[in-house]
Amino acid sequence: MTRRFTMTPNSRNPVKTPVSGMKVAPFPRHSIATEEVRRRDMRVVREKGYRQQCVDGILRFLVENGYDGQVSQKILHNPSSKDFQSIFKFLYGFVDDFTFSSRFEDEVVNVMKNLKYPYCGEITKSQLSAITPHTWPVILSMCSWLVDLISHGTSLLQQEEERSVESCFFEYVCDGYMRFMEGDEDDTALEEEFERRVTEIYTGIFKEIDRKKEELRRIEEMISEARKMSEGREELDRKKRELTDDLNMLIASEKQLEGKKRKYLGAISRLSEEIVKVEEEIESLRAQEDGLRAQITKQRINPEDVKEMNAEKIELFKELERMKPEKESLMKVVGEQEREAQERAEEVEKLFFDLKGLRDEISLRIVKDGKGVPRVANEVSGEVFSGMSGVIVRLEEELNSKSDVLVTAEMNKSILEEARGEKESITSELNSRLGYYSDKLVMAGKLYLEKKEISENEQRKSKTEMELLENELLKLNLESNTSLLMSEQKLQKARIVLDRTLNSINYEREEINKMIFGFYNAAMDIHASIQSQVGDLRALLNK
C-alpha cells in the first residue's frame, strides 16, 4: 500500500490527477511536525539572477508536466493573483489531493507549515491575497522550493524502485540464513515468497512490455491495412490532388479577376450610360422620323407622283421651248404690225395736220350728198372735190381695218401673256414642290448617314472591346498556366516532405523496436542472473 507523505488527513474526495496525466506522487515525511522555528532567510530573494533562476525552474517544470494555463517568462515575473493560485494548485497536486476552498490564503500558509517550509514565517495572508511586485519575490522563492521538493521526492521514489529488487534479494538471503542458523532448512516457502515479490515487481514492467508489443503489432497491422487501402486510393488521391489544384487555381484566378471585374463593371456602367444616352438620341430621332413619316403620309403626293410631276415638268419645259419660236414670230408680227400701224397713224395724223392747215385756209369739210355718199366741199366757196372724197374714204377704211388688226393683235398678245403667266405659275409651283421633296430627300440622306456613322462607331467600339477582352483572356490563360506550374512545384515539395516524414517515422519505429528489444534482453539478463544467484544460494545452502 502506498504511503502518504504529509501530516494532513486523508480527503474523501477522489484522487486528483494533474494535467500531465501522472498520478499523484506522494512521498513520505520523515519528520514529525513541531513548533515552527523562525529562521533568518539567507537567500537574496530580490536579486535579479536568483529570481530568473527560480522563474526558469518553475517554467521548465510546468511545461514538462503539461500545465494547461497561460505561462511565460513575463507572467512569472509579474503574475496576477489568479495566475498564482492556478500555478500553486497545480504544483501542490503533485504532493497531495487536497482541494482548496475559498480560504485559499489560510490554507496555503497551513500546507506550507505542514511541509516544513523553512521560511514560512515570511509568508503572510496579505501577501497571498494581493500579489504585488514588492511581495512576489518571496512567494516566487516559495514556489521554487516547492518545485525542488517535488523533484527530489520523485527522484527518491525512483531510487527506491531501483533498489527494491536488490533489497528483496538481500532480505531473502538474510531470512534464509537466519532460518538456517535456527535449524530450519525448508526454504520452499521463503523461495515462493521471494519469487512472488520479484514477480510483483516485474509484473508491471512485463505487462507494459507486452502491451507495447501488442500496440506495436496492432500499429503494424493498421499500417499494412492502410497501405493496402492506399493502393486502391491512389487514383482517388490523384483525382483529389488534381481537383484541389484546380480549386486553388480557380481561387487564385478569382482573386486576380476581382480587380478586373470591378474595372470591367465600371466600364460596363459607363457604356450603359452612353448606351442610354444614344438610345435617348435614337428615340428623339425616331420621334422626328415618325413625325416626318406622318407628315409624308398625310400628304397626297408620293414618290411616284413626284416622278410623274417631274416628267410633266419636263414635258411642260419642252412645250415652252416649242412655243418660244411661235411666240417670237407672233411678237415679231405684232411688232411689225404695231410699227406699220404707228407709221400709218403718223401718216394719217400728218395728213390730218396738213389737212387741218389747209382746212383753215380752204375751210374743207366732209358732207354727204342726197345719196349718202361723203364728199369734200369748201365752206367758203362751196366747191365740191369729188376725187379727194374717195381717197379719204379709202384711207379711213384702211385705217379702220388696221385698227381692227391692231386690236386683234393686242388681244392675242394678252391671251399669250396670260398663258405664259399660267405656265410660269405652274412651273414655279412645280419647282417649289421639287425643292421641298429634294430637301426631304437630303434630310433623309443626312439621317441615314448619321445612323450609319453611329452604327459604324458602335461596331468599332465593340470590336475594340472584343480585342481587349481577348487580350485579357490570353493574360488569364498565361497566369493560370503559371499558377499550375507553381502548384505542381509545391506538390513536388510536399511529396518530398512526405517522403522525409515517412522515412523519419520508419527510423523512429526501428529505434523504438531496438529499444524495446534491448529492454527485453536486459530484463531477461536480469532474470537469468537472479535465477543463477538463486541456484548458487541453493547450492550453498545444500552444502
Curated annotation (Swiss-Prot):
GO BP: cell division; mitotic sister chromatid biorientation
GO molecular function: microtubule binding
Gene3D superfamilies named in the record: Ncd80 complex, Ncd80 subunit
UniProt feature, compositional bias: Polar residues: 1-14
Keywords, ordered alphabetically: Cell cycle, Cell division, Centromere, Chromosome, Coiled coil, Kinetochore, Mitosis, Nucleus
Entry coiled-coil feature ranges: 203-356, 450-483
Disordered: annotated segments: 1-20
Matches recorded under InterPro entries: Kinetochore_Ndc80, Ndc80_CH, Ndc80_sf
Major localization class: nucleus
Assembly description: Component of the NDC80 complex, which consists of at least NDC80 and NUF2.
Family: Belongs to the NDC80/HEC1 family.
PANTHER family xrefs: KINETOCHORE PROTEIN NDC80, KINETOCHORE PROTEIN NDC80 HOMOLOG
Functional description taken from the UniProt entry: Acts as a component of the essential kinetochore-associated NDC80 complex, which is required for chromosome segregation and spindle checkpoint activity.
Protein name: Probable kinetochore protein NDC80
Organism field: Encephalitozoon cuniculi (strain GB-M1)
